[in-house]
């Protein structure tokens, strides 16, 4: 069972509770934190709780943890004057602690010292360090504390370079592991190693197929609360992220961010090869394959390869005969949504594509593209045999018959 230290100057140990390491905020303090800091707070509190649980503590789940697991705003935000109680553990003389060693073991290596200048009587050093100025590491930690032991800054666990202010029961070995990359925690089943208890616990949930979060609507279970929240939005149709410009709503903030670029015209992803810019990173990835010639998506049926996955999906329908897009007007079916969209224009008589040069309108984008070659004189289709060029692919096909001597048209 994890222990906690007694009053200053005492070596007596008592039982450690979650409240000892829980950090609570007043409403004003909580509103001062930005989104990233609030997320950091959630992560730290959940990790602390899991660490205590993994050490064999049999406690009922606190309301604060229940709220945080459901991504809710903490309901019991209040002022908790714990800033002066957070000790500093010297990482300079820290010994490597094995995962089997409990928080009790690490606390037994720590004794209370008093810093008269800053008035914080519960700051702690390793036994081997008698004074704060004994090593450069302590000096740095002490100076930082003297400058910024304000409630909010201390509560969000700010790190100055490599000198970190730990909460009362943190194991500094875990902090060091983040810098050194050492992974002391091992999964007994598969042997995979981790730096932190929370990462090990998360991994164990996956390979044991334990799904703690259940949808009340359909009974489906999930490994993580965030996955459950995501699933619920699909069922309810909830779209909480709304564009202020046009009112369109989205399920995820990332979708709203991408959508806003339509209004701003922002294209942050630029091709280093040709300079063309795109709104989405995935579009840039697909575009780069034009330059590299890479075609990673291959048809298992005929071996034909494609640069984008969607092109392979459409191609496979040639083999299967699947035509999932049906015209409601005439019942004709198509294997591609864009082909259906083009077809519908036949019924409406709409001609949405206009030539900027002469004003002529067309019902298909490919038709207006071909038409523009009349104005530009562009001839993109070239005969490999004689280098003669043509505006349209059909003209090139007819021309090739001259070289092959083929006579495809037969009198019946």
From Swiss-Prot:
CDD domains recorded: KRAB_A-box
Keyword Nucleus listed: yes
GO biological process, one term: regulation of DNA-templated transcription
Domain KRAB: from-to ranges: 16-87
Any Pfam family the entry gives: KRAB
Source domain of life: Eukaryota
Start and end residues, zinc fingers (C2H2-type): 157-179, 185-207, 213-235, 241-263, 269-291, 297-319, 325-347, 353-375, 381-403
Gene3D superfamilies the UniProt entry points to: 6.10.140.140, Classic Zinc Finger (3.30.160.60)
Descriptive protein name: Zinc finger protein 735
Underlying gene: ZNF735
């Amino acid at each position: 069972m994890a222990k906690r230290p007694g009053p200053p100057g005492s070596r007596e140990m008592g039982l450690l509770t979650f409240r000892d390491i829980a950090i609570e905020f007043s409403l004003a303090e909580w509103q001062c934190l930005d989104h990233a800091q609030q997320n950091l707070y959630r992560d730290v509190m959940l990790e602390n709780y899991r660490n205590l649980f993994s050490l064999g503590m049999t406690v009922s789940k606190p309301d604060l943890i229940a709220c945080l697991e459901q991504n809710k705003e903490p309901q019991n935000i209040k002022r908790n004057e714990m800033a002066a109680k957070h000790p500093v553990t010297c990482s300079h003389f820290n010994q490597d602690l094995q995962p089997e060693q409990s928080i009790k073991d690490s606390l037994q290596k720590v004794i209370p010292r008093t810093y008269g200048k800053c008035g914080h009587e519960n700051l702690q050093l390793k036994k081997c360090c008698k004074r704060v100025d004994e090593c450069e590491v302590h000096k740095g930690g002490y100076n930082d504390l003297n400058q910024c032991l304000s409630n909010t800054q201390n509560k969000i666990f700010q790190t100055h370079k490599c000198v970190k202010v730990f909460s009362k029961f943190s194991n500094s070995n875990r902090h060091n592991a983040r810098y050194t990359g050492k992974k002391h925690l091992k999964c007994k089943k598969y042997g995979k190693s981790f730096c932190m208890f929370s990462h090990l616990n998360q991994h164990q949930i996956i390979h044991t197929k334990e799904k703690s979060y259940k949808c009340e609507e359909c009974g489906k279970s999930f490994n993580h609360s965030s996955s459950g929240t995501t699933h619920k939005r699909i069922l309810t149709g909830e779209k909480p992220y709304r564009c202020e410009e046009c009112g369109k709503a989205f399920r995820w903030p990332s979708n709203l961010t991408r959508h806003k670029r339509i209004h701003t015209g922002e294209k942050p992803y630029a091709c280093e090869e040709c300079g063309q810019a795109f709104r989405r990173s995935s579009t840039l990835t697909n575009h780069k394959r034009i330059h590299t010639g890479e075609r990673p998506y291959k048809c298992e049926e005929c071996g034909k390869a494609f640069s984008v996955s969607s092109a392979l999906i459409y191609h496979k329908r040639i083999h299967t005969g699947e035509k999932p897009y049906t015209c409601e007007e005439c019942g004709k079916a198509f294997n591609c949504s864009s082909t259906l969209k083009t077809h519908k224009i036949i019924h409406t008589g709409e001609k949405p594509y206009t030539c900027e040069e002469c004003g002529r309108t067309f019902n298909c984008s490919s038709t207006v593209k071909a038409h523009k070659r009349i104005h530009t004189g562009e001839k993109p289709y070239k005969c490999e045999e004689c280098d003669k060029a043509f505006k349209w692919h059909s003209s090139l096909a007819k021309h090739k018959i001259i070289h092959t001597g083929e006579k495809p048209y037969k009198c019946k």
